[in-house]
Amino acid sequence: DPNSPQYLGDLFSWSAIGARTTESQTHREMASGLSMPVGFKNGTDGSLGTAINAMRAAAMPHRFVGINQAGQVCLLQTQGNPDGHVILRGGKAPNYGPEDVAQCEKEMLKAGLRPALMIDCSHGNSNKDYSRQPGVAESAIAQIKDGNRSIIGLMLESHINEGNQSSEQPRSEMKYGVSVTDACINWEVTETLLREMHQDLQGVLSARLSQEV
């Protein structure tokens, strides 16, 4: 809902615009007024242009009708959001590897943007097989350990229990803690993966930050 983010904004610290919505001018304007980083997913075909153009648009000031912090309809004037980034979610093929990341960095620099990207471990990067998410995450962590400075985060699809289920079945037959949208890894796998990433990156991120200061 592009009308309510200013009213709900204090509840969130990060936002993402999906692959099919990144082209929307309404959502680009909305992103320009959010007081948080916003990620734009690459196109469903894997193209980067839409996400990069969305970042550039969201960094500019805009005016549009919305709802303010008091819940009142008003004309909002934004200053632009400098904290946009690309989310690599795959497309016709995965795009989380070192060559794909380097290509994204190159295109962002060409557009006058600071390379900043997030790796979506699900969707096209896992070929829609939720059990492959840890492998994608491990690749991204390896790139960071090898010196990559543009990868700023990872996206996982996680739930209490693994897999997914239809929301159209009788409620009495639905399983507790199982996604009704995309298939997810379970909490045990998620916790193990998070602990492993923390261990692998100890000292790495702090060193990267000290180099950027």
From Swiss-Prot:
A single Gene Ontology CC term: cytoplasm
GO MF, one annotated term: 3-deoxy-7-phosphoheptulonate synthase activity
GO biological process: amino acid biosynthetic process; aromatic amino acid family biosynthetic process; chorismate biosynthetic process
Top-level division of the source organism's lineage: Bacteria
Keywords on record: Amino-acid biosynthesis, Aromatic amino acid biosynthesis, Transferase
InterPro entries per record: Aldolase_TIM, DAHP1/KDSA, DAHP_synth_1
Protein name listed in UniProt: Phospho-2-dehydro-3-deoxyheptonate aldolase, Tyr-sensitive
Species the sequence originates in: Enterobacter agglomerans
UniProt lineage: Bacteria, Pseudomonadati, Pseudomonadota, Gammaproteobacteria, Enterobacterales
